[in-house]
UniProtKB/Swiss-Prot annotation:
PANTHER family: UVRABC SYSTEM PROTEIN B. It comes from the Bacteria. It is found in: Cytoplasm. Residues 31-188 form the Helicase ATP-binding domain. Pfam families: Helicase_C, ResIII, UVR, UvrB, UvrB_inter. It comes from Streptococcus sanguinis (strain SK36). Residues 626-661 form the UVR domain. This is UvrABC system protein B. CDD domains: DEXHc_UvrB, SF2_C_UvrB.
């Protein structure tokens, strides 16, 4: 067990001072948290600096904080921002560590068993270990996570009880330390020294913690006593300094001591016998044979190695949980009095609520056909009510909070004023009769001013037809559909910003990364057709795409005024009036956001330095593609090291697309 530091303070470092309505929002949020309010909503318009407000709140309430985003890209962006705001505190990143993941599944109609197949990202695995160890060591911790934080993880008690604590003067033999390291899943490797491994040279043991990627620790013995402990560069062996205490956390989150392992194995065997009897009674002899063979192999691995592939499927027995009891997750590593912030809560809460059912149906198939014991069903994400039971205090952050959040609390704190003075755009409704020619005139007016246009349609066919028509009319236009891959999408957005074309047509323009300050017109076709992208929230989010330009304008083409349209228009007008009054009072003139246009194509050029210009990937031979992947992987690691996770994710997607060609 380790002693957790509880008196560290968050130190916010920023050249900015709260402005606009940020000071009031920060004060209200902090007062409510300190007053014991369980749930509240920060309803912040796009571009109002919600992350900065969140940072101010974290610094002032000084609680360990979990920030949940609805995908890895957004989590990476938030992680980078919080790292800049809190350079002297522990800002951690916890997302799924799979670059590629095919879950274990069975399709009875074709008698197809799909074995679990995955590619683990070593960098993300390191960051996950860094997050859990930081939570057990100190109180000034921010963990930015995706929804994977509600999936099963090992017991925090077993994890912390398994920590190997070392200090100079400690009486412990070298061999005892080696055995202790093996017990917590470290591997001995005297040649290939990497994370989660140790090596031995006489009376010196070098240990590479699972939460580090460059620094290791050298433990020097004098007889059966630790003489000194040094931190060293893993690659060069250069000594960085001496340490007074070293806590070595397990190399895996699923760790169990020997006594608990024997109890767990006995329970697994008992469950196996019970399930085999059920299968035999039902005449399912093939299923019984399959289950017996697989489970006995896993038991043997657990007995000999303390680990097996798919060990998480036995986590109920290893944790000592009852049937149906929720698994341990990242949330259990936090102290009781912690703060949760849900970014883009209208999206994220839907994911949190929906994870359990999808996981359950897949695993039931595996159990019914003898691929897993029934206890595998308890290796799962949390149900909604189980997640709620972990909530001590929570802040939902969104421009358009969902029904769920509004049901949880009546406390809504608004943040509407943008530091740039930008206003929510003007919105007008025009009839559908002659809408295409009307829109063509609006596009041409924007082209003359070197501004861009977004057009959102409801169907793929309409988007394609519209694109073809505008091309015939001489408009430089592109259509962005759902089949376009991440990297290609990024290139399209870049070309739009550079003026390679002037109009982007799409169905869903609410994906991350589609914020283009050059867009001054957003046209919404079929605005009166109620649905996911034409409900109040969808319309407000779409309208927000024109809020980065001082000339922002939105035209809805519709023949009737739906309630969703009216509410979206009214809300936008309300915000705009507040923003205009603030600007007038403070003499602020709205300025279009100046955003750097990153040249992603240079990534390809850098990966192929012997080429004079960027080439089509399809034209490369297998060896050239292999060389490109190797160089791109280096650039991806470099981007991650610089905390530019958005670029790192884009390079990763490019690598996956190139690999898919082989």
């Amino acid at each position: 067990m380790i002693n957790r530091i509880t008196d560290n303070k968050f130190e916010l470092v920023s050249k900015y001072k709260p402005s606009g309505d940020q000071p009031q929002a920060i004060e209200q949020l902090v007062d409510n948290i300190e007053g014991g309010e369980k749930a509240q909503i920060l309803m912040g318009a796009t571009g109002t600096g919600k992350t900065y407000t969140m940072s101010q709140v974290i610094a002032q309430v000084n609680k360990p904080t979990l920030v949940i985003a609805h995908n890895k890209t957004l989590a990476g962006q938030l992680y980078g921002e919080f790292k800049e705001f809190f350079p002297n505190n522990a800002v951690e990143y916890f997302v799924s560590y799979y670059d590629y993941y095919q879950p274990e599944a069975y399709v009875p109609s074709s008698d197809t068993y799909i074995e679990k197949d995955s590619s683990v990202n070593d960098e993300i695995d390191k960051l996950r270990h860094s997050a859990t160890s930081a939570l057990l060591e100190r109180n000034d911790v921010i963990v930015v996570a995706s929804v994977s934080c509600i999936y099963g993880l090992g017991s925090p008690k077993e994890y912390s009880d398994s920590v190997v604590s070392l200090r100079p003067g400690l009486e412990i033999s070298r061999d005892k330390l080696l055995n202790d390291l093996v017990d917590i899943q470290f591997e001995r490797n005297d040649i290939d020294f990497q994370r989660g491994k140790f090596r031995v040279r006489g009376d010196v043991v070098e240990i590479f913690p699972a939460s580090r990627d460059e620094h290791a620790f050298r433990v020097e013995f004098f007889g059966d006593e630790i003489d000194r402990i040094r931190e060293v560069e893993a690659l060069t062996g250069r000594v960085l300094g001496e340490v007074d205490h070293l806590a070595i956390f397990p190399a895996t989150h699923f760790v169990t001591n020997e006594d608990h392992m024997e109890v767990a194995i006995a329970k697994i065997q008992a469950e196996l016998e019970e399930q085999l009897a059920i299968f035999e009674k039902e005449g399912k002899l093939l299923e019984a044979q399959r289950l017996k063979q697989r489970t006995e192999y896993d038991i043997e691995m657990l007995r000999e190695m303390g680990y097996t592939n798919g060990v998480e499927n036995y986590s109920r027995h290893m944790d000592g949980r009852s049937e149906g009891e929720p698994p341990y997750t990242l949330l259990d590593f936090f102290p009781d009095d912690f703060l949760i912030m849900i970014d883009e809560s209208h999206m994220t809460m839907g994911q949190i609520r929906g994870m359990y059912n999808g996981d359950r149906s897949r695993k039931e198939m595996l159990v019914n056909y003898g691929f897993r014991l029934p206890s595998a069903l308890d290796n799962r994400p949390l149900r909604r009510e189980e997640f709620e039971s972990h909530v001590h205090q929570i802040v939902y952050v969104s421009a358009t909070p969902g029904d769920y959040e509004n049901e949880q609390t009546d406390t809504v704190i608004e943040q509407i004023i943008r530091p740039t003075g930008l206003l929510d755009p003007e919105v007008e409704v025009r009839p559908t009769m002659g809408q295409i020619d009307d829109l063509l005139g609006e596009i041409n007016a924007r082209v003359e001013k070197n501004e861009r246009t977004f057009i959102t349609t409801l169907t793929k066919k309409m988007a394609e037809d519209l694109t073809d028509y505008f091309k015939e009319m001489g408009v430089k236009v592109k259509y962005m559909h759902s089949d376009i891959k991440t990297l290609e999408r990024t290139e399209i957005i870049r070309d739009l910003r550079l003026g390679v074309f002037d109009v982007l047509v799409g169905i869903n323009l609410l994906r991350e990364g589609i914020d283009v300050p050059e867009v001054s017109l957003v046209a919404i076709l079929d605005a009166d057709k109620e649905g996911f992208l034409r409900n109040e929230r969808g319309l407000i989010q779409t309208i927000g795409r024109a809020a980065r330009n001082s000339e922002g304008h939105v035209i809805m083409y519709a023949d009737t005024m739906t309630q969703s349209m009216q509410r979206a228009i009214d809300e936008t007008a309300r915000r705009r009036a507040i923003q205009m009054a603030y600007n007038e009072e403070h003499g602020i003139v709205p300025q279009t956001i100046k955003k750097e246009i990153r040249d992603l194509i240079s990534v390809t050029k850098a990966a192929l330095p012997d080429k004079e210009e960027t080439v089509e990937i399809e034209s490369l031979n297998k060896q050239e593609r292999k060389d490109m992947i190797k160089k791109l992987e280096g650039q991806m690691q470099e981007a991650a090291g610089l905390l530019d996770f958005e670029l790192a994710a884009q390079i990763r997607d490019m690598i996956l697309e190139i690999k898919a060609m082989d």
